[in-house]
Amino acid sequence: MKTVSVIIPYYRKIKYIKKSIDSVLNQKFKNFEIIIVHDDPRNKDFDYLLELKKNNNKIRLIKNKKNLGAGFSRNKGIKLAKSKYIAFLDSDDTWKKEKLKSQISFMKKNNLDFSFTSYDQIDSEGKKLKTVKAPKLQRYDDLLKDCRIGLSTVILKKKLINKKFKFSNLKTKEDLCLWLKLSKKYKLVGYNKNLSKWRKMKESLSSSTKQKILDGFRLYYKHEKFSITKSIFYLFLLSFNFLKKNYLR
């Protein structure tokens, strides 16, 4: 049995996926499996992923019959995982070599169910932009207005994910939606060690902003059952803190 299952949902990131996979394969900690969930049935990138998987029994490649989105693809990967711990990595992000060894050791030493770490923000070419430090703890009330948890820094015990606690079908904010649910029952503990690199991609500002606003409102109104007024209030706080964290140096 492997100690860690690394879940990577894949959707049209052919420029970066090899770097992401290599950053896992080059870990000092070796007792892991990689589960790549290919979420674009019409795209030919699957053949490229097969080549990357070739002759490597650490990699499992799953192909969705239809596009499920990143959240549901992660749920599928988790369900197939055979490890005690689950780690998440997006297909354009990377890890530092000591990531798994250091973070798993931290979790075992402190008997933790969930941890996240500090990370570097990098641009599309890999140039460092800034470092985002992990707070000691992310409580429910903190998360409502400012999420400091980088998805590709998270490791949690598989037992935490079930029918009640899993990723939603939101196109964005699906990770925050899960963190909020988990924070009501578990401690989400930060490890102030820089172990990951999060790639800040250039995207259509108008389309991405609209989607994030819609999903943010759905998060509070539909999933957290807030009133319209309360949902708008927290959406404003979350958006302000996101802009402050990601666009102000």
Model-predicted segments: where are they?
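Cell-envelope/extracellular polymer assembly enzymes that use nucleotide-activated donors
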Residues: 2-5, 23, 33, 177
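Short, well-formed alpha-helical segments that are part of the catalytic scaffolds
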Residues: 10-26
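Acidic donor-binding segment of Leloir-type glycosyltransferases
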Residues: 21-63
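Glycine-rich, basic loop-to-helix element that forms the pyrophosphate-binding segment
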Residues: 64-81, 102
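Short aromatic/hydrophobic "clamp" motif used to bind/position activated sugar donors
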Residues: 86
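The conserved acidic donor/metal-binding loop of glycosyltransferases
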Residues: 90-94, 118
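Conserved donor NDP-sugar-binding/catalytic core segment of glycosyltransferases
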Residues: 98-129
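Conserved nucleotide-sugar donor-binding catalytic segment
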Residues: 131, 135-211, 219
